[in-house]
Structures are given as C-alpha cells and as structure tokens.
C-alpha cells in the first residue's frame, strides 16, 4: 500500500493557562500537530491517534528533508491502510513534556530565561488529554469518530472516554492497561535511577553544561526494550549467538566486551535512543505512566470509574505481551461489560511481545480495518 507521502508538522500556540493535575499552571505553551486526510463537511470523520513513550505527533508519512523519517505508525495509517486517510481525518499531537517540539523541559522557562529542565512540572495522562482537547477545539472538532492508541497511547484513549464522554464515539485501546502493576513501576524506577545517577545529569540542568546523560539514557532504554520483546521473540532473533566476524572462532573472549548478539542489539538500541531523546522527558513520561489509575478516585473500582462512559470500544491485546499482559486488557473489558457498554475484544497470538502493536501483523491489522469499516459506515466516511 502507498504511503501518505510527504507531510509537515505545524505548531499550535495556546495562551489560555492550563492547570495541571499537580496544581501547577502552564501559561503560554505550544503543541506540535500533524494531520492526514481531509476533514469532511460535517466534521464527523476525525480520529485522534495518541502516541506512546518515545513517539510523537509524526504518526505517518515522511518529511521532505529526510526520506527515512517514516512515521511511527505508518503501517497502520495512510491511504488504504487500516486507518484509511482517504476516509478519515487523522490527527497526531505531540504531548506536553516531550522533546519533539511541544512545550517541555528543553523549552525556555519565561520565569528564568533558561530551559525548564527538571523544573518542568510533572504531567499526567489526564493533563495530556485536556491539552489535546484544546487542539480539537482549535480545529473545530466537537466529537471524534475515534480516539486510538497503543500502550501509553491506549491509556490516553481510555482517559478520553472517561474525561470527555460526549466527545468520543469510539475508543480503540491496544496493548494497554488500566494501571501499571508494581513490576512495571519497578522497571520505570530502575530506568529513572540510571538517568538520575548519571554524573552528566546535573540535577536535570545538563543543558547549561553542554552535556547529556547518555549513559543513563542508554541503560534506561535497554531496560525498557527488554520488556517490549517476548522471550520467544528474543530467542528466535538472537538465541545465544555470539557476535563474531565471519570466519572467526566461535569461542568466548573471556572479557566484558560484547560477546552475544543480544548484547550488541541492546547497546545499539540504547545508543540510538540517547542520540534523539531527552532525559528529563523520559523521567516525566515514565512518571505519567506510573500515575495513571482512573479507578483510584473510585476506591479502586474500575467498573465505577467507567460508569459514565458513552463510547463504543475496541480493546486488543497480544498473547506474548508480558509488559501489559492480556489479563490487564480483560480488566478493562470486564469493567465495560459491568456497565453494559458496547465492547469488542481480541486477544491476538503474535510472537513479538508488547511491540506487536507497532508491527504489521495481518490478523491484527485486519481486525482494526474491520472496526474502522464499521465507524466509516456510522459517520458516512
């Protein structure tokens, strides 16, 4: 299928202060947005795609100055793809606190004239949703045909259906969870500790020192990446293969250099991540993950938390995902059924672990495609 082609982001500026869940207030702020497809005359075909930890507004297509800059969900969004931009107007928003253009730690704090750094306020999933709602307002979109996301993006989609029940017709929540387990919070804490203990972190003000806590970022990414893959997938990709030049002896070196292919892969992923991501942003986003728990205000009762939702739901999980296991998606499904909501659930046997939501699996994509066919009929797209 063809790509959507060359795209360009645009920056939206907001002067109305945004009060965050923490009580902090952001005054003037900006959000970077990309759109694909055409909004129909009655504005009924808009779909918001929410991004996960290290992604951004750049959902699909490529940039004119970098043909390798393919959007993070390009296999899902585009002409003739499961989310068909010939039929839907698709919006990607870069969240507050990110490092891809929206207001975040790298931006100048008006109060000091220097980058916010660690002074940037902690943000939550709910804060992101409220900011995204202002984007929708600015675009004249009263109601989304669907809000969709995978992983952390799925949490945002679920939060949309809770916070703005009148503005979401369908919620598509993939490889997600209603709250992080203690194990997941622990993974995030270890990753943050790697960053915080890097001598180049400088309390979050490393910009002024002209350095970056690369070592901490590398380790944080390596930890995270392990949790995104399944054991079977890692065994198939790497096994216990040694990293050796062609013709070299298949024997141990008896040192602490890279010995195994899996070590080489993790170091490569860590180095690549440290090149483009910001450490303060990593801290903010993982804390937002930790804090997401819509049932908390209802004494832990997820069914009560979802009682006022009005959307229809597609919930999907992957059998080999141990980061956000299918049991967590089934918790959402049960809570929705307790409230007699319309919900479709699929548990997909894909070998790639948590990252399966990003990959081109035929059964998964056919599921999403079929669901959007239903939405298209409803909105006349």
Swiss-Prot record:
<dbReference type="Pfam" id="PF00561">
    <property type="entry name" value="Abhydrolase_1"/>
</dbReference>
<keyword id="KW-0486">Methionine biosynthesis</keyword>
<feature type="domain" description="AB hydrolase-1">
    <location>
        <begin position="45"/>
        <end position="360"/>
    </location>
</feature>
<feature type="active site">
    <location>
        <position position="354"/>
    </location>
</feature>
<dbReference type="GO" id="GO:0005737">
    <property type="term" value="C:cytoplasm"/>
</dbReference>
<dbReference type="InterPro" id="IPR029058">
    <property type="entry name" value="AB_hydrolase_fold"/>
</dbReference>
<dbReference type="GO" id="GO:0009086">
    <property type="term" value="P:methionine biosynthetic process"/>
</dbReference>
<dbReference type="GO" id="GO:0008899">
    <property type="term" value="F:homoserine O-succinyltransferase activity"/>
</dbReference>
<comment type="subunit">
    <text>Homodimer.</text>
</comment>
<feature type="binding site">
    <location>
        <position position="221"/>
    </location>
    <ligand>
        <name>substrate</name>
    </ligand>
</feature>
<protein>
    <recommendedName>
        <fullName>Homoserine O-succinyltransferase</fullName>
        <ecNumber>2.3.1.46</ecNumber>
    </recommendedName>
</protein>
<keyword id="KW-0808">Transferase</keyword>
<keyword id="KW-0012">Acyltransferase</keyword>
<comment type="pathway">
    <text>Amino-acid biosynthesis; L-methionine biosynthesis via de novo pathway; O-succinyl-L-homoserine from L-homoserine: step 1/1.</text>
</comment>
<dbReference type="GO" id="GO:0004414">
    <property type="term" value="F:homoserine O-acetyltransferase activity"/>
</dbReference>
<dbReference type="InterPro" id="IPR000073">
    <property type="entry name" value="AB_hydrolase_1"/>
</dbReference>
<feature type="active site">
    <location>
        <position position="321"/>
    </location>
</feature>
<dbReference type="GO" id="GO:0009092">
    <property type="term" value="P:homoserine metabolic process"/>
</dbReference>
<feature type="binding site">
    <location>
        <position position="355"/>
    </location>
    <ligand>
        <name>substrate</name>
    </ligand>
</feature>
<keyword id="KW-0963">Cytoplasm</keyword>
<comment type="similarity">
    <text>Belongs to the AB hydrolase superfamily. MetX family.</text>
</comment>
<dbReference type="InterPro" id="IPR008220">
    <property type="entry name" value="HAT_MetX-like"/>
</dbReference>
<feature type="site" description="Important for acyl-CoA specificity">
    <location>
        <position position="323"/>
    </location>
</feature>
<keyword id="KW-0028">Amino-acid biosynthesis</keyword>
<comment type="function">
    <text>Transfers a succinyl group from succinyl-CoA to L-homoserine, forming succinyl-L-homoserine.</text>
</comment>
<feature type="active site" description="Nucleophile">
    <location>
        <position position="151"/>
    </location>
</feature>
